[in-house]
């Protein structure tokens, strides 16, 4: 039996045993088109998906609905993905987080262009992100990461 089958089986059993609802995923990304693409993909797998375009909007949604999994971009204006993870920890939310990021090009001190996605991704991993995905990534990897995060979330409770 493949690992993903075991993961889905465990998820289905635990979900059926605890409550009669679809697992919920909050997708946080300031790129609306990307957020909608992820939401459509996960909704087709049977998830109840909500999108937030910033960490601040996500914090409100988390307080109101407490999603089962959060998928967040690292780099966003205002409250970014790392700040959101800090907020989750400070407010004692035990929600598995999947962190996503693309290459981010910054202008250095002397005008040089540098790619800085690794520092944010390393910080997210050290803060307990259950999965770290680099854009672009495939649908199967996203679906598997969410299934694993849900299984991880079940063991937390």
Roles of regions detected by a PLM:
Residues 83, 104-131, 140, 144:
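Alpha4 helix (beta4-alpha4-beta5 surface) of REC/receiver domains from two-component response regulators
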Residues 65-71:
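Active-site beta3 strand of CheY-like receiver
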Residues 76:
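Receiver (REC) domain active-site loop signature in two-component systems and cognate sites
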Residues 29, 73, 101:
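Active-site residues of response regulator receiver
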Residues 60, 82-94:
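Short amphipathic alpha-helix used as the core "switch/output" element in two-component signaling
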Residues 36-40, 44:
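Charged docking surfaces used in two-component/phosphorelay signaling
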């Amino acid at each position: 039996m493949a690992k993903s089958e075991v993961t889905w089986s465990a998820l289905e059993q635990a979900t059926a045993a605890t409550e009669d609802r679809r697992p919920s995923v909050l997708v946080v990304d300031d790129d609306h088109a990307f957020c909608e693409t992820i939401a459509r993909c996960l909704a087709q797998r049977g998830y109840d998906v909500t999108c937030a375009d910033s960490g601040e909007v996500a914090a409100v949604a988390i307080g109101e609905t407490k999603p089962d999994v959060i998928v967040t971009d690292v780099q966003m204006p205002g409250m970014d993905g790392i700040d959101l993870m800090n907020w989750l920890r400070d407010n004692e939310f035990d929600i598995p987080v999947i962190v996503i990021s693309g290459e981010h090009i910054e202008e250095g001190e002397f005008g040089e262009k540098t790619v800085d996605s690794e520092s944010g991704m390393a910080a997210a991993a050290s803060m307990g992100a259950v999965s770290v995905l680099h854009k672009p990534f495939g649908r199967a990897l996203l679906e598997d990461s969410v299934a694993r995060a849900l299984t991880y979330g079940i063991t937390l409770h």
